[in-house]
Amino acid sequence: MEKIRKNKIYKNIYELNINFGKSKSNKNISENYIFNGRSVSAICFNRKLKIFYFIQQFRPNYFFNKFKVKPLEIVAGGIKRNESSRQAINREINEELGVTAVSLKKIDSLIIAPDCLEEITDVYLAEVPVIKKFEINNPKEGEFIKIISLKKNEALELVNKKSTQNLVTKYALLKIRDIKI
C-alpha cells in the first residue's frame, strides 16, 4: 500500500513523497503536483430554436501553437472558494452568455489530463433562454466573448473535422449526438 506525504511548496503547488510499499526494494519517488482545483462546463441549448450555444474567446495556447486563436468552446470556468459546482455553472453561464439557465442537469465529471492538468470538470446540460446579444465583454475577467449558435447538424459536422479542439468541447460535441431537443 502506498504512503503519500504532501508538502506545500507554494500556493497550489505541492511536493508529493510517495512510498510504494513496505519492502526495501519498493521505490520511493518525489513528484511536484499543481492542484488546479475544480471547474465546470456546460452544453448550452435552446429547445425552442433547437440550437446549441458555443463561445469564442482568445486563448494564448492556441496562439503560441499557431492554431486559430479563438477556438469554438462550450461555456466553462473555475469554481470559486465557497461556491458549489451548481452555483459556479450558473455564474459562468451568466458571465459568458448573459442569461440565466432555465434548467441544469449534471451529466458527467471528467479529469482533463491525468498527470498533466489534474483539474476535474463537472459537465452540465443547460437549457437557456433565447440569446439576443452575441458579444459579451468582461474586462475584469479578461474575457471578450463572441457567442455562436449552431443547429445540431452543424455541431455534429464539427465532430468529423480533424482540427485541434479542447477536450471538453470535443466531448460536448460527441454528447450532442445523443441530446434530443
Where are these regions (language model features)?
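Conserved hydrophobic/aromatic beta-strand scaffold that supports enzyme active sites
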Residues: I13-E15, I43, F54, V123-L125, ...
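Active-site-adjacent beta-strand/loop module that shapes the phosphate/pyrophosphate-binding cleft
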Residues: Y14-K24, A113-K133
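Nudix hydrolase/Nudix homology domain
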Residues: K68-L72, R81, K140-I181
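Conserved Nudix-box catalytic region and its N-terminal flanking loop in Nudix hydrolases
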Residues: I34-N36, I43, I51-R91, E141
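The catalytic Nudix box helix
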Residues: I74-I107, Y124, K140-E143, K151
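Acidic, metal-coordinating catalytic segment for phosphate/diphosphate chemistry
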Residues: R5-K48, F63
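Structural motif
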Residues: F52, V69, E118-V123, I145
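Short loop segments at secondary-structure junctions
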Residues: G21, N46-L49, F58, E127-I131, ...
